[in-house]
């Protein structure tokens, strides 16, 4: 029992020392108090003895001293380890902070598998796959760099779009927003004729360009002044804008594919910029070639009727402007003298007609008239002319051929009553294109009202 009592006493001493440590006293004070307590216990030990053993109490006291000395040694060793324990306690706040950060670290660990999957999906594709696509794009672009000689337009500087222009945008200009993307549609004014025009236009372009009905209508609007008057600068911007729309459509296709989206987003900016600009130039060159073909063949696509008498020169395979140039150069003493129309006098009125048949005598400047004069179908002249017919003076008619066709009004002129001659003007007064002050367009000279 006494042994248990001593153990309890020692534990109480240790507990009291820990309380003093918690209240801020230094470790030397703990040692001093413990030594005092030990001395007090050692001082009382000789007076203690067991009941009915009064004669042998000295031996018991010695035994108790030996036992307590061992216990005191254990306590001293424990006190020696107290500073280290205190250091551990001082480090506990830092450990607590580390524990607080553990949840975020756990979140990072949870995202590692997804990141690993992304890394596995992105390895060599940007450098290999997109580089191959870029090489193919540049090769195709070089093939489509310029229009074919057969479809290269002539004349008409007002609608000239360079076919050898290369467009390069900076990476900041390619912030492609796929919201609000609307495909093009056939214009309302073209719906009645679009099928015929689109079919023939597709044959002219071939499978290499393969235009759609909507694209045909879009190009048609650039030459149709009834819809929007335009110039070469406006048309160029429209073609560039439409090429960017095609690139946006390509990007939408990439975004819809999870596989390609990861590959595209993982590629470097320099590579993506090259791909985007190459796609832009490919689409732009395609639009320019379709634009050139439509400009050259526009009279035949839109206004060439089946009756050959309404086509200038009777040649359906070439543009009207080219045909007019050939006839005037080969059959007239003046290089650009139009021979496809004459002014005729019948009574008190003038009739502007298109000749379906011509006969030429020895004098190249004389044109024979048909036996039967055709009736005037419209108050609009097929060509604006300025001529002198005997003493009948016809004032110059200024007309501008817009891109939808010839649009001019013929103002009747009342001749002097004193003159009744019906003869044609002499060769010196032959009609010339310069006198008419006519602005030629590549579409040729035609009047939709005569069709």
Curated annotation (Swiss-Prot):
Q: What compartments host this protein?
A: Secreted; Host nucleus
Any idea which UniProt keywords this protein has? Answer: Host nucleus, Secreted, Signal, Virulence
Biased region (Polar residues) positions are: 305-323
- Primary location group: secreted
Q: Where is this motif: RxLR-dEER?
A: 48-65
Q: Where is this region: Disordered?
A: 303-336
Instruction: Tell me the first and last residues of the signal peptide.
Output: 1-17
Q: Name one GO cellular component term.
A: extracellular region
- What is the protein's known function? Secreted effector that completely suppresses the host cell death induced by cell death-inducing proteins.
Q: How does the record comment on the protein's domains?
A: The RxLR-dEER motif acts to carry the protein into the host cell cytoplasm through binding to cell surface phosphatidylinositol-3-phosphate.
Membership in a protein family = Belongs to the RxLR effector family.
> What is this protein identified as?
Secreted RxLR effector protein 70
- Species: Plasmopara viticola
The gene is RXLR70
